[in-house]
Amino acid sequence: DVLVLLAALLATASGYFVSIDAHAEECFFERVTSGTKMGLIFEVAEGGFLDIDVEITGPDNKGIYKGDRESSGKYTFAAHMDGTYKFCFSNRMSTMTPKIVMFTIDIGEAPKGQDMETEAHQNKLEEMINELAVAMTAVKHEQEYMEVRERIHRAINDNTNSRVVLWSFFEALVLVAMTLGQIYYLKRFFEVRRVV
């Protein structure tokens, strides 16, 4: 019974990885009722300078949030009216680099009607399960965020490591060439030339 109740109380969360080509824009839509809490968490995982333009618009085409060249972010708001909300990621500023963006759209519970709010007591177990569900969702999002950050930093470390190895090989070749050059020069310096 508790598991069924927990599954019913969990807020919906949609997590995605999306590839956005250069000069392109990708939009996602969520239909909610007025007063519903919504959140967007995003992170640019790969591509260029790891930046993306983000825009959230309401059903009335009113801008709720706009961010330019952001690499990650968290934004939470309450729906101001019933309708479809639009979440857009734009890579129009990039000339040739596609970006891979990880994002999660959290949709909270719809606000309860007046008749439910006037009840004398709310079930304590239901409240605790709801709090636990919210905490579990937050932990899941943080873990996904850390996985993306780890992937980014691993790529940077691998790139740096390969450059250091290549530079070391180059330095070794230069050292060998200089050694051979000095040996040749010193041999010629101490050679006795005979004039016949």
Swiss-Prot record:
Belongs to the EMP24/GP25L family. Monomer and homodimer in the endoplasmic reticulum, endoplasmic reticulum-Golgi intermediate compartment and Golgi. Probably oligomerizes with other members of the EMP24/GP25L family such as TMED7, TMED9 and TMED10. Interacts (via GOLD domain) with TMED10 (via GOLD domain). Associates with the COPI vesicle coat (coatomer); TMED10:TMED2 heterotetramers are proposed to be involved in coatomer association. Interacts (via C-terminus) with COPG1; the interaction involves dimeric TMED2. Interacts with SEC23A; indicative for an association of TMED2 with the COPII vesicle coat. Residues 25-107 form the GOLD domain. Pfam families: EMP24_GP25L. One of its GO terms (cellular component) is endoplasmic reticulum-Golgi intermediate compartment. It is a single-pass type I membrane protein. Keywords: Coiled coil, Cytoplasmic vesicle, Endoplasmic reticulum, ER-Golgi transport, Golgi apparatus, Membrane, Protein transport, Signal, Transmembrane, Transmembrane helix, Transport. A motif (COPI vesicle coat-binding) lies at residues 189-196. The chain crosses the membrane at residues 164-184. Its main location: membrane. SMART domains: EMP24_GP25L. Residues 1-15 form the signal peptide. Involved in vesicular protein trafficking. Mainly functions in the early secretory pathway but also in post-Golgi membranes. Thought to act as cargo receptor at the lumenal side for incorporation of secretory cargo molecules into transport vesicles and to be involved in vesicle coat formation at the cytoplasmic side. It comes from Cricetulus griseus. Residues 185-196 are cytoplasmic. A motif (COPII vesicle coat-binding) lies at residues 189-190. It comes from the Eukaryota. Residues 16-163 are lumenal. This is Transmembrane emp24 domain-containing protein 2. The keyword Phosphoprotein does not apply. GO terms for biological process: Golgi organization; negative regulation of GTPase activity; protein localization to plasma membrane; protein transport; vesicle-mediated transport. Residues 112-162 form a coiled coil. The keyword Coiled coil applies. It is found in: Cytoplasmic vesicle membrane; Cytoplasmic vesicle, COPI-coated vesicle membrane; Golgi apparatus, cis-Golgi network membrane; Golgi apparatus, Golgi stack membrane.
